[in-house]
Amino acid sequence: MKIKPCKSQVFRLEPIIGSRKYINYFWSFSIFFGAFGFLIVGICSYLKKELFFFSAENIIFIPQGAVMCFYGIAGIFLSFYLWFTMILGVGSGFNEFNKNEGIVNIFRWGFPGQNRRIKICCLIKDIKSIRIYIRDGISPRSALYLKIRGMPDIPLDVIEDRFNLNEIEKRATELASFLRVPIEGLE
């Protein structure tokens, strides 16, 4: 189910992509094929034969071949995990702000089980502020949080693009003016 963004004077609907990002598809393919190569080379070192394009003449099975098999199996499981989260759409959902009813609904899909559907409802009048979080360094990250009385901060969106500070500020300003609340976190 694809949700289209909707903005008006009294209603906002913001879709959240979650784990279905292009970079996750890239990494799941890359990890799978790299791990598959490790596994094939490990098997070739055990059988002392060439399979496909993989040659393991100079690799002794114990310890190098066994370690390559282990890394290959671990990488394949990791790529299956990434595919599983993307197929299920973990982290995807929507943020709904409705001034007519005076409520905010935040919905996300989780992993299968008891808490597969994560839904948070609150009143607009209970919102204290919009908080901007920015972390620089090796893995930069930016996020918008909703600060609500009596609840922990709720992440609205995570933006992993390090050069898009203007977009983060713009989104926070639009949402804060829509909800008529202050912005925190920018110095």
Swiss-Prot record:
Membrane topology value: Multi-pass membrane protein
Annotated compartments: Plastid, Chloroplast thylakoid membrane
Keyword field contains Nucleus: no
First-listed, main subcellular location of the protein, grouped into a coarse class: plastid
GO CC, one annotated term: chloroplast thylakoid membrane
Regions crossing the membrane: 23-43, 70-90
Gene Ontology BP annotations: photosynthesis
Keywords on record: Chloroplast, Membrane, Photosynthesis, Plastid, Thylakoid, Transmembrane, Transmembrane helix
Pfam families listed in its UniProt record: Ycf4
Family statement: Belongs to the Ycf4 family.
General function of this protein: Seems to be required for the assembly of the photosystem I complex.
Protein name in UniProt: Photosystem I assembly protein Ycf4
Source organism: Chara vulgaris
Lineage: Eukaryota, Viridiplantae, Streptophyta, Charophyceae, Charales
